[in-house]
Amino acid sequence: MILRGVAQAYRKKGNHIITSKIEHHAILHTLQELEDKGLATVTYLDVDENGLVDPEAVRAAIRPETILVSIMTANNEVGTIEPIKEIGAVCREAGVLFHTDAVQAIGHIPMDVQDMNIDLLTLTAHKFHGPKGVGAVYIKKGVRVPAMITGGGQENKKRAGTENVPGIVGLAKALEIQTENLEANMKKMTALRDKLIAGVEERIPTVHLNGDRFKRLPNNVNFGIRYIESESILLMLDLKGIAASSGSACTSGSLDPSHVLLAMGISHEEANGSLRMTLSEFTTEEEIDYVLEVLPPIVQRLRDMSPIYPKGGVE
């Protein structure tokens, strides 16, 4: 709605949109469609080894015909939190609209659209324990976004169709609960996250933490485990009752390495050995201890069977 709507509403000014190479496919595929239809030209910004977008790279990419910059608040795979406030300030100075995909961030870290210079923001309920299939969009007053679904005047004439009232109320209530407990939840999840990271790095040799170690969501951990493929790890963890993934949920059926990790300069081999674990405020210390008990022998067993694992092991 936002990407297509802005492209349509501001086409007289231009058609140039700026984003990053590590965005969610909801952004990347929509922009690719706009490009294919000749409705937009898109600049895809590089990121550094931690997945961070440089605000100065955004500034350098802005042209007279630039109408929108879209950079996610935090990455869904590696948990890196982007310098959204600084990027928003660059956009504000240049007179360019700024959209952020805040799906991973809302309910997990503090956010303020005014302080962070955000014009457009999207979120979804299931990321903070709300109902699935329900989302919301913030549109700053004065920003033009035409309806992409027409036929009625619902939702301030932005999206036609009978409203899903239980879903809307469920989203609002879940966000209310999450916001009230945000500080305590962040403190708890950060402590558990750091314990998991330290424990894995201590117990498993040749493991790499993907994403920024400090500018990171409190509930995200992503490891690169060399010499084995993540699918094998996931199968064995599943047998032990541990839910994990190798990338985003939306690409769980694909065997291709993560576009996020590749954009961060990680090799295909290491990207194929990525392991993502997501915590919540309901995660317990006992569960972290269980993962630290189960994961190292699984990794060693798989490495012992791997033809690329060095004989004699690794330090």
Language-model features, listed with the residues they occupy:
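Pyridoxal 5′-phosphate
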Residues: 1-315
